[in-house]
C-alpha cells in the first residue's frame, strides 16, 4: 500500500490489510514513478518523479480454435516456429512508419507484434486441438491525442492487430474464439505498469 519512512529513509512497508512490516532496507523492483507515489514523493530527487515512461505497449491474449497457418511456413500442425517468439516486423522502413504513426496518432495501425503460443509447450493451457496466444504489440502511446481515450480506441486497435497477424497467417482471424484486450491504460490500472510500460 505504501513505503514507510523513518529517520529519512525507507523503514518498511504498510500492506493493504493494515499490517506494517519494519525492515532495515526496502528493495523495490518497480517503476520509479510508482516508488515515489508509494513513498509519498516529497523528498525524492526530481529524476524519480520525472522518469520517462514512453514505451507503452498493447497486449492481447487470444483463445484459438487452431494454430496460425503462417504463409511463410505453411501448416496448422505444431512446428518449431509455433513454439518460438514470432516477431511480425518487416524491414526498418516499416518500423519507422509504425513509430511515426504512433507518435502522431497515438497508435500504429501496423504495429510490431510478437506472437507467443504457450499452449504449444504446455497442453494444459487449452482444450485438445485448441490453443492460446499472447500478442505483445509495440508503437502504442499511453496518452492519445485529440482527447481520445483507450476506452474508445481499444476495440479498433485490437482489430488492427488481428488484421496484421491475419496478413501473415490467413486463418488467424477466423480461428479467434475469444480475446482479452489490455490497452496501455488497462496495463496501468490492472497491473500497476505506469503508462503501460512493460
Put a short name on every predicted segment:
Residues 92-96, 134, 159, 193-197:
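Contiguous hydrophobic segments
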Residues 108-116, 169-198:
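A glycine-rich dinucleotide-binding beta-alpha-beta segment and adjacent secondary-structure elements
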Residues 165:
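Structured binding elements
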Residues 5-11, 146-150, 182-196:
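Short glycine/threonine-rich loop-to-helix capping motif typified by GTGT followed
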Residues 33, 37-39, 63-65, 127-160:
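Conserved FAD/dinucleotide-binding core of flavoprotein oxidoreductases
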Residues 2-126:
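Mid-domain catalytic core of redox enzymes
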Residues 48, 97-102, 153-157, 187, ...:
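Charged, low-complexity, helix-prone segments enriched in Lys/Glu/Asp/Gln
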Amino acid at each position: 500500500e505504501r513505503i514507510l519512512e523513518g529517520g529519512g529513509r525507507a523503514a518498511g512497508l504498510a500492506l493493504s490489510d493494515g499490517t506494517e512490516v519494519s525492515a532495515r532496507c526496502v528493495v523495490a523492483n518497480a517503476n520509479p514513478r510508482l516508488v515515489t507515489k508509494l513513498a509519498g514523493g516529497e523528498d525524492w530527487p526530481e529524476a524519480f518523479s520525472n522518469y520517462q515512461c514512453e514505451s507503452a505497449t498493447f497486449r492481447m491474449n487470444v483463445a484459438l480454435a487452431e494454430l496460425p497457418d503462417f504463409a511463410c511456413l505453411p501448416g496448422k500442425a505444431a512446428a518449431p516456429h509455433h513454439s518460438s517468439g514470432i516477431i511480425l516486423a518487416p524491414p526498418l522502413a516499416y518500423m519507422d512508419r509504425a513509430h511515426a504513426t504512433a507518435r502522431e496518432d497515438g497508435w500504429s495501425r501496423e504495429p510490431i507484434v510478437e506472437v507467443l503460443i504457450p499452449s504449444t509447450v504446455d497442453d494444459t493451457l487449452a482444450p485438445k486441438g485448441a490453443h492460446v496466444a499472447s500478442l505483445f504489440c509495440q508503437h502504442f502511446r499511453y496518452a492519445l491525442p485529440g482527447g481520445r481515450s483507450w476506452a474508445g480506441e481499444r476495440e479498433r486497435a485490437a482489430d488492427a492487430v488481428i488484421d496484421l497477424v491475419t496478413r501473415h497467417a490467413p486463418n488467424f482471424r477466423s480461428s479467434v474464439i475469444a480475446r482479452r484486450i489490455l490497452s496501455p491504460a488497462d496495463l496501468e490500472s490492472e497491473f500497476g505498469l505506469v503508462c503501460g510500460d512493460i
